[in-house]
Amino acid sequence: HFPAQLSGGEQQRVAIARAVAKNPAVLLCDEPTGALDSATGVVVLEVLEKVNRELGTLTVLITHNAGIADMADRVIRLSDGQIAEIHSNAAKKAARELSW
């Protein structure tokens, strides 16, 4: 398949696979679910969860979807380019448990 023939979710999974191929210490994901429907977004987040769990990669996820924060170990919220809040999640949720 050519890239244009892949769905948005497939393109995101390929992008994650390319990023993970070199076994990075840090995986920076800028809006990985931004252009996806919620079902496909959950699949992409599950892939990121699996990479984080199995490879021990530090995953930094940037998003405008505040609901995704519930699956993070640590959340840093920005407001007007400044750190507004930092907190840890005592009860993390799995990607399938998130509210969109």
Question: What is each residue range found by the language model?
Answer:
Residues 1-71, 77:
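ABC family nucleotide-binding domain
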Residues 74, 82-100:
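Conserved beta-strand-loop-alpha-helix hinge in the C-terminal portion
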